[in-house]
């Protein structure tokens, strides 16, 4: 049976493989058109690229007014620039920035089918949709762990950060803020989409609080591991980004948190109700994050200064 709509080009391409003359002709015309387009694009720039000498024009100085900013803002911009300047850093430690909005859009698109399915499977456990969707947000957010290797990535230039006229805590707080900013903002997309596909209940609000609490917990845990497991003997930045024990612990802790959040609810937490369960989980998560935040501000800052 012939297909129609967006899948029709694939149908024609498949028919060409069966020996259909018209389909083979159409496929050949499309390939030739693409070839002609690429030829036109390359003919404009290929010769210039291959004959370039690498010489560049002399830079002309233009006086500009520099806007004054606080030390905290300057440190934040420094850490953000370090993250965006490294493709390896962004790809391995910031994948959640892309996947969180994608997950939200998918939920908005398929939420009308997913939520009734969850209710049908776990009908006896009320509020299961809120807990499981919150679990999904936490699992995707765990892919952001840019604070964990940030201390080790200072490398031989660590002395610069230590010699700046700022406190060690200010330097650590800037690293913490980068992960929080780059995770909270994308996470708002799926959380808002959850509000669009689920009824407005206390458990829905608490699922958002739990997800944001986990993001704070994850950032504090990652930076704590980064300070305690700092290594400056690497020869490639991929070593602290992908191969360090601190990054591995941070990554697996996010998965374990998601498993615990969903698993404990399905085992026994549903008897408390989704709202009470999420409130308890959020409180415990914030308490753990608060303890690590206090350690970073006191002993962690001293340890960073002594590295």
Task: Locate predicted features.
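Hydrophobic alpha-helical transmembrane segments of membrane proteins
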Residues: 1-159, 167-307
